[in-house]
Swiss-Prot record:
UniProt cross-references to InterPro entries, sorted A to Z: SmpB, SsrA-bd_prot, SsrA-bd_prot_CS
Spans through the membrane: none
Gene Ontology MF terms: RNA binding
Function: Required for rescue of stalled ribosomes mediated by trans-translation. Binds to transfer-messenger RNA (tmRNA), required for stable association of tmRNA with ribosomes. tmRNA and SmpB together mimic tRNA shape, replacing the anticodon stem-loop with SmpB. tmRNA is encoded by the ssrA gene; the 2 termini fold to resemble tRNA(Ala) and it encodes a 'tag peptide', a short internal open reading frame. During trans-translation Ala-aminoacylated tmRNA acts like a tRNA, entering the A-site of stalled ribosomes, displacing the stalled mRNA.
HAMAP family for this protein: SmpB
Family, per entry: Belongs to the SmpB family.
Chief localization: cytoplasm
Keywords: Cytoplasm, RNA-binding
Localization terms from the record: Cytoplasm
Pfam families named in the record: SmpB
Alphabetized NCBIfam families for the sequence: PRK05422.1 (NF003843), smpB (TIGR00086)
Protein name: SsrA-binding protein
GO CC terms of this entry: cytosol
Length: 152
């Protein structure tokens, strides 16, 4: 059975630049104008990442556009946003990202079936240049395979 997800934003660049070793789902603390802007699909997580500050995890550099109909109560577009995780998950994440070379990257942002905004995070390790070339070759080979299958 598949879950309902209305995807708001995806970080395709992260899948190219990192090896994703583990995926997690986290809630996010938002203001009302941010939620309204997300409902219109005005968000970008291309350059966003998450980091720990003691016993909490925050999402940095996530751009949520200002909501036009909100007056003076509008939000800052790139403010750090707190991620909602269980304490056990936070400790596990902190342990993993303290290892050299690992980072916590936002992969996608979506509404779940209860209309709550969720962020899919990935514990990732950066790819080297030759790894990126290999992934491009694999992608091209899969595309060529599908073309050959369609021609037959």
């Amino acid at each position: 059975m598949t879950e309902y997800k209305k995807v708001i934003a995806q970080n395709k660049k992260a899948l190219f630049n990192y090896f994703i070793e583990e995926r997690l789902e986290a809630g996010i603390v938002l203001k009302g104008s941010e939620v309204q802007s997300l409902r219109q699909g005005k968000a970008s997580i291309e350059e966003s990442h998450a980091a720990d500050t003691g016993h909490e995890v925050f999402l940095y550099n996530c751009h949520i556009a200002e909501y036009e109909k909100a007056n003076r109560f509008n939000h800052s577009t790139r403010r750090p946003r707190k991620l909602l995780l269980h304490t056990k998950e936070i400790k596990k994440i902190i342990g993993r990202i303290r290892i050299k070379g690992y980072t916590l990257v936002a992969l996608s942002m979506y509404f779940n079936k209860k209309n709550k905004v969720k962020v899919e995070l990935g514990i990732a390790k950066g790819k080297k240049l030759h790894d990126k070339r290999e992934s491009i070759k694999e992608k091209d080979w899969k595309r060529d395979q599908s073309r050959l299958i369609r021609q037959k």
